[in-house]
Amino acid sequence: MEKFKELLQGEVPLLVDFYASWCGPCKTMHPIVEQVKSMLGDKVRVVKYDVDEYENIASLYHVRMIPTLILFKKGKVIWQHSGVMRAQELFQAVMGAI
């Protein structure tokens, strides 16, 4: 939790991918998130949290569906999406929010 708090307060926006290893749509999103991560470069930090392992963090942000992507800037939620989306849509949403 401390590492997560540090990441949240960083200068670089943080995109969190909440997923589960048993979730089919999460497996679909994995390569998409990785592709967008490389497209974003240093503009955004991307991390993944397994909701079964980090239930406290998922609960704190009311993650009810997976996959859920939440974009933070200086500790505040600035964008959120649940479900699968295409790489270009994700990239444009993140760039539009930051």
Task: Label each region the model flagged.
Residues M1-P13:
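A short beta-strand-turn-helix
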Residues F18, V33-K37, G41-N56:
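Thiol-based oxidoreductase modules, predominantly thioredoxin-like and allied folds used
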Residues F18-Y19, Y61, F72:
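Conserved hydrophobic/aromatic "anchor" residues
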Residues E11-V12, Y19-W22, M65:
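Short pre-active-site segment immediately N-terminal to redox-active cysteine/selenocysteine motifs
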Residues E2-F4, E53-I57, E89:
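Short acidic active-site motifs
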Residues E55, H62-I70:
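Structural micro-motif
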Residues F18-I32:
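Conserved redox-active cysteine motifs that mediate thiol-disulfide chemistry
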Residues K73-I98:
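Non-catalytic, surface beta->alpha helical segment in thiol-disulfide oxidoreductase systems
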